[in-house]
């Protein structure tokens, strides 16, 4: 097992790419902590993982609130004694065409708070715990849009994801001496609730191929596609990889004009 005896916090772990990573990590021997705001959904997913032989706990937390992030870290340490892996996956997108002169300030603040501030806070409070145990892996789930602007995405979303990419680089150089590796995943169009596709619909090929014109592979990615990328960064297979970005986008970035 590639993550045997490891402990991972996955923010936004109750749905989409976070759930995909949680299920894969658990199958590889990792104890996973699903962090999120929706208690009933999170506890249901954690129960599903346990029923399939994995170790999973849901902890309710809003990653944009410092005190709740501190509590998330403290509860994880109390339950498992350590944190080896952090997957900063929680994210929102208001799905509006928001140029700087158009986007609502309240919506802007909300997206930045969850996507970027949330990743910053989790990193801030996890790093000391990783230093104590001699290292760890931090994975930031950004976007193919962290380095390319489009007319169809909001200013806040682009800035939040671009900021996550730079958070990876800053954290990488700051903590490499402590054997903490930090990497970014850049997903393209993945079939998640953010894309209005529920987990139960993932086996429906008509739905998955509904956005076939978006990317060269002519289908949307599955949450497991991002989960396996996260598994690589979480495992010792990437022990010499830090400060890196991995595109999981079906070729989308190659065709963005």
Q: Residue ranges of each PLM-predicted region?
A:
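Alpha-helical segment proximal to the catalytic Tyr-Lys
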Residues: 128, 173-177, 239
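Conserved glycine-rich cofactor-binding loop
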Residues: 14-16, 38
């Amino acid at each position: 097992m590639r993550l045997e005896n490891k402990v991972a916090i996955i923010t936004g772990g109750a749905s989409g790419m976070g759930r995909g990573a949680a299920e894969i990590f658990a199958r590889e021997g990792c104890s996973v902590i699903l962090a999120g705001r929706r208690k009933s959904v999170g506890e249901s997913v954690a129960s599903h993982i346990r029923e399939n032989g994995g170790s999973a706990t849901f902890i309710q937390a809003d990653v944009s609130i410092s005190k709740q992030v501190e509590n998330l870290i403290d509860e994880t340490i109390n339950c498992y004694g350590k944190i080896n892996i952090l997957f900063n996956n929680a994210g929102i997108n208001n799905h509006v065409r928001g140029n700087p002169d158009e986007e609502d300030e309240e919506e802007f603040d909300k997206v930045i708070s969850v996507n970027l501030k949330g990743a910053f806070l989790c990193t801030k409070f996890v790093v000391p715990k990783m230093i104590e145990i001699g290292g760890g892996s931090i994975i930031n789930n950004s976007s193919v849009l962290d380095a390319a602007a489009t007319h169809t995405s909001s200013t806040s979303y682009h800035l939040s994801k671009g900021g996550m990419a730079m958070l990876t680089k800053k954290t990488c150089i700051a903590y490499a001496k402590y054997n903490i590796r930090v990497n970014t995943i850049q997903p393209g169009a993945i079939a998640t609730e953010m894309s209005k596709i529920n987990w139960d619909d993932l086996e429906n090929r008509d739905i998955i191929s509904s956005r076939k014109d978006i990317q060269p592979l002519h289908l949307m990615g599955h949450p497991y596609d991002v989960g396996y990328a996260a598994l690589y960064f979480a495992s010792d297979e990437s022990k010499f990889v830090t400060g890196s970005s991995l595109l999981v986008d079906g070729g989308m970035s190659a065709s963005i004009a």
